[in-house]
């Protein structure tokens, strides 16, 4: 398995442990990039579906997953995705901020099985003084850990700046996903889980 480390892959162990709690789960990775997370999830999931709207990136993910019969990549957006059946787990890693938040959370909620789970490693915009202070306090630890892990800075993925602040994300999630757990993470990320 070809692997790399960056501020997103740093949270792969957290995602793997959550999926491992649901043996043989049907998992959707939205904005799956080059398929690294899907590849790591193969021992834990019964079926893996990756969505990647960028044609070249989707090809790279499909190449990575070639020979894994229970994993596939679809070159389409989440908005256009119509699954055959609900998912047990839906994952967004640094992809939710590329989409309109409320409609995406509503669709996610609708695509989950009755006991399904949403897992997000997301980015939020700095809007308030507190946001900027937290980000400033993370600079040194994030840089030191990036050096220690040998961060791969450019993995060829599509990037976009976050649109909503963490307060806005919390308010939207509170309204649409009652009981969602949201917390700040390291590396300028937030973590969301909802069942």
Specify the residue positions occupied by each region the protein language model found:
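Short conserved loop adjoining the S-adenosyl-L-methionine
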Residues: 80-84
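Conserved alpha-helix/loop element of class I SAM-dependent methyltransferases that forms part
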Residues: 6-25
């Amino acid at each position: 398995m070809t692997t790399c480390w960056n501020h997103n892959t740093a949270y792969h162990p957290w995602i793997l442990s959550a999926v491992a709690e649901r043996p043989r789960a049907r998992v959707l990775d939205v904005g799956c990039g080059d398929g690294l997370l899907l590849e790591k999830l193969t021992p834990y999931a019964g079926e893996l579906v990756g969505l990647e709207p960028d044609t070249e990136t989707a090809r790279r993910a499909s190449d990575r997953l070639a020979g894994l019969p229970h994993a596939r990549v679809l070159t389409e957006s989440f908005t256009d995705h119509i699954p055959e059946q609900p998912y047990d787990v839906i994952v967004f890693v640094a992809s939710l901020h590329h989409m309109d938040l409320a409609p995406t959370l509503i669709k996610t909620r609708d695509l989950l099985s009755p006991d399904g789970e949403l897992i997000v490693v997301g980015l939020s915009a700095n809007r308030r003084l507190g946001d900027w202070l937290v980000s400033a306090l993370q600079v040194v630890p994030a840089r030191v850990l990036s050096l220690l892990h040998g961060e791969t800075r450019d993995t060829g993925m599509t990037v976009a700046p976050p649109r909503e602040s963490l307060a806005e994300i919390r308010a939207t999630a509170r309204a649409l996903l009652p009981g969602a757990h949201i917390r700040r993470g390291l590396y300028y990320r937030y973590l969301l889980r909802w069942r």
